[in-house]
Amino acid sequence: MIEVGIVGGSGYGAIELIRLLIQHPNVNIKYIFSHSKQDQPIKETFPHLEQLTYHYETLNSEGIECDVIFFATPSNVSKHIVPQLLSKRIKIIDLSGDFRLTNRATYETYYGETAASQEYLNEANYSIAEWSNVNAQTTQLIANPGCFPTATLLALHPLIDKDIVKQDNIIIDAKTGVSGAGRSLAQHVHFAEMNENLSAYAIGKHKHKPEIEQYLSLLAQQEVKVTFTPHLVPMTRGILSTIYIKLNHAFTNEDLHNLFKDYYEDKPFVRIRSLGQFPKTKEVYGSNYCDIGIYVDEENQTAILVSVIDNLVKGASGQAIQNLNLMYGWKENTGLLQSPVYP
């Protein structure tokens, strides 16, 4: 049994961590930190957690004694605290973007904030769980991937890895629910602004664009650029990413479908849909699954991939726990066996 703490405990990502970790057989939640809710019972903020007796605490790195700290905070928080915690040999799983990008200048361009020191960016293990090499002996700091990159990279990984696509014209059209914007008030997520509305945002400058490009470039061993456009849709949870990519070999639908089935055969959280079927966001709601549908336009050899995840689970807290399991050598689905909630 290990003891963990959660920083940012009043946000959606943290609440999902709590929901999942209280069901984990190998984890005890010792701390839940929130600067804005100090000393308040958690059930006052979230009445659906009436059974929990935790009170929010203020983070003081000197007095913390536990095995792992999860940061479920916005960017520009964890990078100021993580060095002190690492010096105490506390392992970190950071759900924010502070340690995802290895290039400080790129971070500062897209996030508009000063980057973490290069020492800690180099130490961080960016961990798409399906391809992770984390372990308890050598891994101290995990940069948990973002939601859009998770949905996108799981779909693209087999094609880039097998070098069967043209890497200069990857188009990603992604839709997300409003929980991805967090709990803070903002005009674009007010009901009157969002309801019966669909909008593209952060075109060409979304923080997840360089994250996707960084991972694909490392995998391809050459620079990969993408065209990435996110859209906000009037639903609470979910991401649907539709990806268009030119193939550099002649493939039939059956060929590409079989490639994906073989590639993900031993990955419990990636489900490849039957040929001709495509996933919907409701079909992974509340779960750690990523469902992928595949189509080949055989006339012009373009692959069209449809990937769906729950942005708060596989796109955040669920993958963080999956990475925790991998780090400690537990079965990666430990504590993550929840079926999707439907309808």
UniProtKB/Swiss-Prot annotation:
The active site is at residue 147. Belongs to the NAGSA dehydrogenase family. Type 1 subfamily. It comes from the Bacteria. Keywords: Amino-acid biosynthesis, Arginine biosynthesis, Cytoplasm, NADP, Oxidoreductase. Its EC number is 1.2.1.38. The keyword Cytoplasm applies. This is N-acetyl-gamma-glutamyl-phosphate reductase. PROSITE patterns: ARGC. Catalyzes the NADPH-dependent reduction of N-acetyl-5-glutamyl phosphate to yield N-acetyl-L-glutamate 5-semialdehyde. One of its GO terms (cellular component) is cytoplasm. It is found in: Cytoplasm. It catalyses: N-acetyl-L-glutamate 5-semialdehyde + phosphate + NADP(+) = N-acetyl-L-glutamyl 5-phosphate + NADPH + H(+). The lineage of its organism: Bacteria, Bacillati, Bacillota, Bacilli, Bacillales. One of its GO terms (molecular function) is N-acetyl-gamma-glutamyl-phosphate reductase activity. It is an enzyme of class 1 (oxidoreductase). It holds the Pfam family Semialdhyde_dh. Pathway: Amino-acid biosynthesis; L-arginine biosynthesis; N(2)-acetyl-L-ornithine from L-glutamate: step 3/4. GO terms for biological process: L-arginine biosynthetic process.
